[in-house]
């Protein structure tokens, strides 16, 4: 038994009748131990092993220096193992530091309110434009394939029901999982989705942001959700019921979301690796302005995709927006070309005209004399992008993970570390998790394509993206450049 300190028990000795002797008178001993009969000890396993093995030959004397050489190699191997362990610990600490920095940043962003964003914000045009793009993605890709437009107002016979409202048996609501929900800024957009939302689950690693999202949801419930009620032709209609919402603090890139009770209740497929996913229960997973944080390393990217694919039912959609890797690659390539041209001009002692031409090629990243190391950077008064280290000359980021840059957005983001999502690599990895690309467009192209849509065009006017009556765009050139840094997408679960 483990923990027993007693020695080995005495073993019974075999009986041998041939060795019997007459009993002898026992001599009294003055000492209790003197003359005591020694008990035979059972052979230990090591004794048995020694008795069975051949006697060791006489060890030959090693040549001088051989032992030292072996010792050096062993010490070097141990040293390398120690360095690897230290590097692993440092990498984990660094990753945790970045994760904490991002979380603390978004926790610290003040909740200024809708009126401030509409009136006092210096980037109100950009805010309105980005919100319109997110609404556009939700409007276009959130409904199920079997959804019939207008089902919320019609009964089973196609008759409008003002007093009773929609027949729940005839309409299935969406089950939405919002990863990186932040402060709940998209709750209103989901309430205005073409197909009504039945359940909304918001996840975010920033606990303060989750608290603010819960408060925003409570305010929406108090207002009745903002749909239905008194409107043209709907005076007798009951206010539309706001969807059921639940919110959780959760790192969706480092841990499985299966531990969340409502996720398990809706359905989560944890079957394993790429290509083996059946289906979860959610109709839509939304990831607005957050997926790029998962590309810090491959493990996080795959955990993120496993969570997304495990949560989505077959036919479900992953929608969202991320920084445009094509824009980043183009900017980096131009910057490096400008740096190279300037270095060559300086070495050759060319004229000031050559210097000026080289600087024009590097217009996206001004270089200051005396810098220890020139790194790619660009931007304007609204946003700034800066890489902390060297970047590929051709702008091709391989391997596709861990390419960090610092991003600044006026009034919103203060030099937060972000990661490039090389688009083709992302698309290929997503296919491993049964996610097939259906849509991908830069924000500026989304505007050009959808601005005259019969639904999305008027929506842009109501959201103050442009003036009423197909008026002028209320987004400055600097704001549009910042918006063009992003791309919207939709993947289908197959």
Language-model features, listed with the residues they occupy:
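Conserved beta-strand signature within the Rossmann-like core of class I S-adenosyl-L-methionine
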Residues: 314-323
């Amino acid at each position: 038994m483990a923990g027993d300190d007693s020695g080995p028990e005495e073993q019974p000795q075999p009986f041998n009748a041939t060795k019997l002797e007459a009993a002898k008178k026992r001599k009294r001993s003055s000492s209790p131990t003197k003359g005591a009969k020694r008990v035979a000890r059972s052979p230990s396993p090591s004794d048995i092993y020694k008795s069975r093995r051949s006697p060791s030959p006489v060890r030959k004397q090693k040549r001088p220096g051989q032992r030292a050489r072996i010792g050096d190699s062993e010490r070097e191997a141990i040293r390398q193992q120690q360095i690897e362990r230290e590097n692993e610990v440092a990498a984990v600490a660094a990753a945790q530091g970045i994760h904490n920095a991002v979380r603390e940043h978004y926790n610290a962003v003040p909740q200024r309110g809708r009126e401030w964003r509409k009136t006092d914000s210096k980037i109100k045009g950009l805010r309105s434009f980005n919100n319109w793009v997110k609404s556009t993605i939700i409007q276009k890709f959130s409904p199920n394939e079997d959804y019939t437009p207008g089902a919320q107002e019609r009964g089973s016979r196609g008759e409008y029901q003002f007093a009773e409202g929609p027949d729940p048996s005839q309409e299935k609501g969406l089950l939405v999982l919002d990863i990186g929900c932040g402060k709940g800024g998209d709750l209103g957009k989901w309430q205005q989705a073409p197909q009504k939302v039945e359940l909304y689950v918001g996840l975010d690693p920033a606990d303060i942001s989750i608290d603010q999202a819960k408060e925003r949801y409570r305010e929406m419930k108090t207002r009745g959700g903002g749909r239905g009620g008194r409107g043209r032709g709907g005076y007798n209609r009951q206010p539309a019921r706001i969807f059921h919402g639940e919110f959780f603090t959760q790192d969706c890139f480092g841990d499985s979301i299966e531990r969340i009770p409502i996720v398990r209740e809706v359905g989560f497929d944890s079957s394993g690796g790429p290509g083996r996913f059946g289906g979860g229960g959610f109709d839509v997973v939304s990831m607005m302005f957050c997926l790029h944080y998962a590309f810090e390393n491959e493990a996080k990217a795959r955990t993120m995709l496993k969570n997304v694919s495990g949560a989505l039912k077959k036919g479900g959609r992953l929608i969202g927006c991320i920084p445009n890797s094509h824009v980043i690659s183009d900017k980096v390539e131009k910057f490096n070309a400008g740096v190279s041209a300037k270095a060559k001009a300086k070495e050759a002692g060319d004229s000031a005209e050559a210097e000026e031409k080289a600087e024009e090629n590097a217009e996206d990243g001004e270089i200051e004399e005396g810098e220890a190391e020139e790194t790619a950077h660009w931007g304007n008064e609204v946003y700034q992008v800066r890489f902390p280290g060297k970047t590929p000359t051709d702008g091709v980021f391989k391997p596709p993970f861990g390419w960090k840059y610092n991003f600044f957005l006026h009034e919103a983001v203060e030099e937060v570390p972000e990661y490039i999502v090389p688009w083709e690599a992302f698309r290929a990895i997503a296919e491993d998790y049964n996610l097939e690309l259906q849509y991908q467009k830069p924000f500026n192209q989304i505007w050009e394509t959808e601005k005259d849509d019969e639904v999305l065009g008027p929506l842009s006017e109501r959201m103050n993206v442009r003036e009423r009556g197909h008026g002028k765009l209320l987004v400055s050139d600097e704001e549009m450049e910042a918006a063009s840094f992003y791309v919207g997408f939709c993947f289908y679960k197959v």
